[in-house]
């Protein structure tokens, strides 16, 4: 017997969060570890979970046969059964639609908050209520732009030359991955036009949303960052000299192929240089099974590493918790964000909060908070020579590194930790609800 949440939360504004991965208590329910992505959702929940006058319902899909529900922190956690993986989820499937319809009937939300347009479960949740419940989408990444820039810096000949059996078998070669993003961008357009309300951080993101859904209402809120990063402070004297930390990779958007080309130039001048790469990786696979599982992109990156003999200069850290990430950043000399497209880059913001001197490709919405020569340095994504020069500049100039790192830390801590997610989100929810009442 499923509980009627009306008996628990009748006096509160009820907001249903639709997330593309389990967060908070949902991870415990499904016995899953912390993910390295989506930390802003965890931080937002931590801030909102005890807010007065609002009750959250956190829902995502899982591989199961029945709806699971539990209550924690006074909020509802709902695991929605699915017979499909999140990547192959069909938003038009009658079973999927019926399960989301049950969730809406059970929790009876006043408003639906969709976290990201990346996966089809978001569209399914919106279709399940047929436009009757006001909805808002928090933009995590603009899929149309990710598709446009997916293979930047990798020529078609290299995409073919380094194609692997596993990618051929799975129809997952780089140009096929790019086409999948374009397909997902079509779904993104449906999501934005149905919800008609979006939360963005940058003008770049707002412009992209309006190009897709011209009449959508845009609300601004800065990306919430885990406060654990403010507990660590970069110090020039204590950092590992000539070491670089970067964002987790695994696919071309993150720009590791360009970073490797720049790093090769750095190593010529500083043979002791180290590049630390977080996240799970099959890059240096040695056993037969792991080598057979290597992706085209991993194989392409490894070809650059091997060509320049960088194997001993690269350290794969594996998956890191937020605190481990903060600690590792604080021990490196320089941070580089090399992506070909980013909406806001939480990783870059986290690094700035720690106080490490940073370098970023000039992409997406980064320029909203990142100022060249003041709190960091920009370079064009397809100019690894410039990136290498900027890294070397930091290595050579202690005063510059300390100045840029200190400025970035001061500005980002003031900006991010002055944010009241409670006030921002609740104000947005109330504005959307009031508009909905007026129009209906």
Predicted regions and their residues:
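Conserved donor-binding/catalytic core segment of Leloir-type glycosyltransferases
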Residues: 16, 235-254, 260-267, 275-278
């Amino acid at each position: 017997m499923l509980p009627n949440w009306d008996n628990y939360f009748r006096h509160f504004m009820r907001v249903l969060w639709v997330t593309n991965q389990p967060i908070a208590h949902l991870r415990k329910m499904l016995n899953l570890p912390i993910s390295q992505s989506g930390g802003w959702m965890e931080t937002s929940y931590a801030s909102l979970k005890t807010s007065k006058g609002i009750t959250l319902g956190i829902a995502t899909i899982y591989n199961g046969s029945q709806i699971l529900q539990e209550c924690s922190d006074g909020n509802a956690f709902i695991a929605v059964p699915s017979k499909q993986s999140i990547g192959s989820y069909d938003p038009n499937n009658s079973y999927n639609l019926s399960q989301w319809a049950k969730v809406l009937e059970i929790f009876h939300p006043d408003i639906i908050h969709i976290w990201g347009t990346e996966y089809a479960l978001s569209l399914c949740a919106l279709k399940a209520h047929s436009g009757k419940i006001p909805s808002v989408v928090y933009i995590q990444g603009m899929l149309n732009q990710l598709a446009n820039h997916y293979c930047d810096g990798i020529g078609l000949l290299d995409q073919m030359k380094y194609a692997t059996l596993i990618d051929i078998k799975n129809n997952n070669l780089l140009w096929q991955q790019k086409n999948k993003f374009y397909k997902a961008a079509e779904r993104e357009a449906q999501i934005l036009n149905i919800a008609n309300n979006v939360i963005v951080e940058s003008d770049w993101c707002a412009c992209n949303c309006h190009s897709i859904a011209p009449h959508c209402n845009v609300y601004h809120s800065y990306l919430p960052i885990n406060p654990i990063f403010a507990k660590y402070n970069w110090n020039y004297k204590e950092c590992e000299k000539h070491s670089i930390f970067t964002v987790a990779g695994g696919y071309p958007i993150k720009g590791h192929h360009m970073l490797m080309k720049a790093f090769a130039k750095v190593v010529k001048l500083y043979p002791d240089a180290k590049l630390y790469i977080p996240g799970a990786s099959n890059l240096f696979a040695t056993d037969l099974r792991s080598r057979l599982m290597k992706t085209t992109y991993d194989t392409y990156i490894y070809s650059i590493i091997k060509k320049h003999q960088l194997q001993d200069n690269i350290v794969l850290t594996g998956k890191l918790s937020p605190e481990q990430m903060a600690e590792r950043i604080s021990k490196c000399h320089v941070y580089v964000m090399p992506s070909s497209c980013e909406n806001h880059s939480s990783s870059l913001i986290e690094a700035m909060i720690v106080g490490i001197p940073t370098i970023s490709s000039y992409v997406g919405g980064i320029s909203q908070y990142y100022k060249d020569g003041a709190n960091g340095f920009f370079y064009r994504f397809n100019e690894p020579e410039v990136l290498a020069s900027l890294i070397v500049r930091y290595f050579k100039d202690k005063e510059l590194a300390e100045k840029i790192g200190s400025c970035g830390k001061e500005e980002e801590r003031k900006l991010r930790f002055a944010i009241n997610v409670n006030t921002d989100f609740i104000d947005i929810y109330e504005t959307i609800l009031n508009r909905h009442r007026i129009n209906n």
